[in-house]
Amino acid sequence: MKDLIITNKILNWYDINKRSLPWRNKVSQEKKQYFTLVSEFMLQQTQVATVIPYFNRFIKNIPNIEKLSKYNDRKLTKLWEGLGYYSRVRNLKKTAQIIVKKFNKKIPRDFYELKSLPGIGDYTASAISAIAFNKPIIPLDGNIERVLKRYLYLKKQSQIKKEFLQDQKKIFGTSTKRSSDYAQALMELGALICKPTNPNCNKCPLSNNCKAFKNKNFDLVKFKKINKETYYKLNVYKKNNQYLLIKNNKFNFLKNLNIFPMDQLNNPKNFDKDLNFKISNMNMNIKIEYKKNHNFDKNINWINPAKLENYVLPTFTKKIIKFLESQK
């Protein structure tokens, strides 16, 4: 009964306050499943506000799973340009190809079949199962984790481990008839009300029983992430006012994308950096060196900095080009 009360409170709040998001539009069941697949890939490590224009452009150009499975790689990367984490879009296309070939163009409903697809782990499989197929599953994303931590007042390191939170989320119960809405409602509650800072408790449907609200302590215990310090020498080759870029087969980040030739250095002494970037869990310190002659014989491109919009380039590379141009 208590679970049902919580569920109804959250669903009632959601019906009134939910955001209008393009992947929530009323469409056929087949389109809803495709929209969910695409949006969940895009939302991995990326905020909703950032994803919306990319999603709209993506769906306009690639309206179904079959077209995605055959879409030109260069055009696909261009559609994704600026979202980062490009392995997501490569995995999304691989997933589409498997769905077309193995599952007769139908996104699989089974959780473990979903998990077998490239780029889909526990969370994404849970989200697709709940949202696209109305299964009574609560996908534990950052928003729902935050609601759970505050509602139960979880303050110990042992209490914020994934395994513990997965067990504790049962406090929210499930909705048999509206599982899709309920999963999204919990996410929405974390995104709009139980925000990382300055939660809007006065509008929260759970505040009466929330232990963080009762204790007036909304601080969140987090695992400390340590960014790895890395050092690189970036080599600049210039000819006819164009920069030489190479296809990256050397580093795990920005795989198969165009970057400047770079060498990683191990704990260099007296390293005088020109630039600093953060990619994933790396703090990249970069020293720029201008070179005259190169010995690259393939996978190179000469880029005109005045026409950057014409190229498929990661933001990382674009920022370096703009920096170099600003130093003239």
Show where each model-derived region lies.
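Intrinsically disordered, low-complexity, charged terminal extensions of DNA damage-control enzymes
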Residues: 1-21, 25, 29, 188-328
